[in-house]
Amino acid sequence: RGGGRIVITASTSGINADPNMWAYNTAKAAVINLAKGAALDLAADAITVNVVCPGPTETGMTTGIKQVPEVYESLRRAVPLQRWGTAEEVAAVIVFLASQAASFVTGAIVPVDGGITANTGQFMPRELPADS
């Protein structure tokens, strides 16, 4: 029998650092590298290990950010898709990585971030039309 799936949640802050968040950035980068090392060590046992890195996501943890509209909007504008993600969108990726369909995926870092990690930061993405 054997085998299995491990899906770890980190953050886009572990891929691209955020200002004034040194400890958080470091912790999330460590989680990503922990998962990559585990993927290598557990592959012989047919256990896959992958990381999901959410970007700005509407959750209980981010509720306070909505109380500061200029911060919330600044983060929204930094997302190329021009919106925050939902917990359901993150969960869908986790469900896939935990499924048999992902049996050949291991050591992957999967951003679920509306394109934040695709942006080098050199240019801000253009605003999408309001009806998008």
Task: Explain the meaning of each model-derived region.
Residues 11:
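Residue(s) in the substrate-gating loop at a strand-loop-helix junction
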Residues 15, 49, 53-64, 118:
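Short, flexible catalytic-loop segment of classical short-chain dehydrogenase/reductase
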Residues 16-22, 45, 82, 100:
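Active-site loop immediately N-terminal to the catalytic Tyr-X3-Lys motif
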Residues 27, 35:
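Active-site helix of classical SDR
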Residues 40-41, 103:
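Alpha-helical segment proximal to the catalytic Tyr-Lys
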Residues 42-44, 57, 85, 98:
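A short hydrophobic alpha-helix cap/turn motif
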Residues 51, 70-105, 112-114:
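C-terminal helical subdomain
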Residues 106-132:
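Short C-terminal tail/terminal secondary-structure segment
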